[in-house]
Amino acid sequence: IGTSKVCCLIARTGRAAPDGTNSAAGQPRIIGAGHQVSRGVRNGTIVDVDATEDAIRKAVYMAEQIAQETISSVTVNLSAGAPQSEILGVDVDIGGQQIDESDLHRIFQQTHTLRETANDPSNGSGSVSERELIHSIPVGFSIDGQQGIADPRGMFGQKLSVNMHLVSASSNAVRTIRAAVDRCHLEIDGFVLSPYAAGLSTLVEDESDLGVTVVDMGGGTTSLSIFYGGEMVFADTIPVGGNHVTSDVARGLSTPIAHAERLKTLY
């Protein structure tokens, strides 16, 4: 749901392609796509819920017609809500036992507890209710001080540590997007931060392992994400995009917006 357009993609996994070949297990294959000129969104933020709802409905309908499928739930890209990144380190005692799924669940739960405590209004550090957690990504495990562990399950140790990359966004902005999508009779399965999605869709494994910065300039926002060690370690979005360049060209040359957009695109 962007400033310049609203897009809907319908994907299928693990099914035969039109040429008779089978897609790789878990590999999504686009079977429908729809897009509409965005109305009611400015600099990535919804300013008119009715207009945004109409654009979402039309984009989804177009994708459904192409895919010949009817969808009831969606995953929504999020670029609004002033996303914030923070790295939080957490330790748990293992007692020399073998690490399993329950230990990972325990350390992730402790991460969320520490975040809520740090943002408790009684501590004078703001209110956690003002921001909604979008992503909680482990960016590095260590066991008894040994770093660089990708997956600690099955290993033994006394202390398990993890650095968690937490990405949050304004609760009000998220609720507004939910309201617009709900009015289209669609259930939201989850949110994906736009710069995170941009990195996942464009980077190869070597790039994300060695370290890379992804910059995605949209119509009303520009997003940035940094990947290292195969994971996103930082993300941010600013409310400035290609439309601002178009407006500057139009003002500088005293030409209509449509002409300025063409000049920007060509040159």
Residue ranges and their predicted role:
Residues I1-T213, E231-V233, P256-Y267:
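Nucleotide/phosphate-binding catalytic cleft detector across ATP-hydrolyzing
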Residues M164, L210-G252:
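Glycine-rich phosphate-binding loop of actin/hexokinase-like ATP-binding domains
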